[in-house]
Amino acid sequence: MNELVYGLSALGISLNSVQLGQFETYYQELVDYNSRINLTAITEYKDVQIKHFLDSVSLVLAGIKGDEKLLDVGSGAGFPGLPLKILFPAIQLGLLEATQKKARFLSEITVKLGLSGVEIISQRAEDTAQNPLYRQKYSLVTSRAVADMATLAELTLPFCAVGGRVIAPKKGDIEEEMDRAATAVKKMGGRVFKVIKVELPGLEDGRKLVLLEKISNTPALYPRRAGIPAKTPLI
C-alpha cells in the first residue's frame, strides 16, 4: 500500500497495521469479486490505491468528524464509504446500493474487513429518502455517482439532517454544472457551501469536492419518483 501511504502522508494521516491490513484485504476481495461481476474497471494494484482508496479518503479535505452518521449514496463497490470507515472506525455508515449483486459484495466485504456499525441498504435512493428511518437522519452524505449535480442534490440532500453536509467529488470545470444545480440545491433545502480543490499525489487531474450544507427541511414531495431526478433534473 505504498501509494496510499504516500498520498495519505500529504494529508497528515498515517495508518496503523490493522488499517493497512484492511485495505490489503479490500483490494484482494475487490479484484476477486470483480472477476465474477462488474464492480470496477480499475483493478491494477497501484491504480486502486490512488483512484479508489486515496480518492475516497480525500474527502477529509472537506472536514469529516470521527463520529459522523454517514450515508454513501450509490455506493457501488463501497467508495468512498468503506475507505472512510476504515480510517474512522467510529463512523456509523450506511451504504445505499440498489443493484443486488453489488449490495451482496458490500455485505460480504464488510464482514471480511471486520467492520461493525455498517448498514447495507439495497434500494433506490428516491424510495429510501421517503422512508422516515432514513430521511434527514444523517450528518454527512457522500456520493461518487456519475450524475449531474442537480440530480445528485435531489438524491442526497433529503437524507441530510438540517446542519448536515453533502460531499460530492467532481472533476474538471464544474462552474456551468453548479449554476444549473442552483435550483435543485435550493429546493432541497441546501446551499453550496464551498468547492475544494484536491491536490494529492496521483490525483492532479482537476478533482474537486463540492460541499453542500443543509439549511432547511426538504419539502415532502422531494425526491421525486425513481428515475425522474436523472431524466428531468430540477434546473
From Swiss-Prot:
It is found in: Cytoplasm. The keyword S-adenosyl-L-methionine applies. Keywords: Cytoplasm, Methyltransferase, rRNA processing, S-adenosyl-L-methionine, Transferase. S-adenosyl-L-methionine binds at G74, F79, E97, A98, T99, A125, E126, R144. Its EC number is 2.1.1.-. One of its GO terms (molecular function) is rRNA (guanine-N7-)-methyltransferase activity. It comes from the Bacteria. One of its GO terms (cellular component) is cytosol. InterPro entries: rRNA_ssu_MeTfrase_G (IPR003682), SAM-dependent_MTases_sf (IPR029063). The keyword Transmembrane does not apply. It is an enzyme of class 2 (transferase). Gene3D superfamilies: Vaccinia Virus protein VP39. Belongs to the methyltransferase superfamily. RNA methyltransferase RsmG family. Specifically methylates the N7 position of a guanine in 16S rRNA. This is Ribosomal RNA small subunit methyltransferase G.
